[in-house]
Amino acid sequence: MLFIDRDRRGGRMKLQDLASVRSGLVLSRKQAKEPSEYRYPLINLRCIQQEGTIQLKEADIYEAKEPLKEEYLSQSGDIIVRLTSPYTAVLIDETTSGMVVSSNFVVIRVEDKSLLPEYLFWLLNTEKIKRKIYENATSNMLGAVNARFLADFELVLLSVEDQRKISQFNLLAKRERQLLRMLADEKEKYYAGVLNQAYKRAKKGK
């Protein structure tokens, strides 16, 4: 079970009392057998980065046989949890809303104002919670966690203000790490270019 200090009402609450927790869409149920006008970006396992972000370039296109209801599409504030290792949770924002979420994931949609999605996103990605998820998942042959396990998590909530402080710092730190990775990638390209040019000049000088 998941425990968080709570200073408001006291007592434990299950995640399902604060949010809807359900599996994503079984794609075969709504998939068109022929080219369709109802095309949606699809969140697949390749999209999910270990740091808890979605790589949009990896998304597939899902062709549905009919317009999909909102319940099948990601919404800003949703938390998508990968059902298989490493059980990464991602927070949906404006850039990743409106995407089909497959049954490879659990969709958590917070419905109670006493729980901030950004805080729950941080919490689900902590080592302590990942370890509990892993312990549950390894008890079955597929090594996958299910929606019921997440729905039954017991929460003891922090105040909304404390949740906000933690989540803001987490998002700031995550953004800084992303920028540092981008900078490191650009430097690698720069160094490779300089070395390549130096090699070419050296060859011409022979």
Which residues fall in each region the model found?
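Basic, amphipathic alpha-helical recognition segments used for DNA target recognition
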Residues: 15-18, 106-156
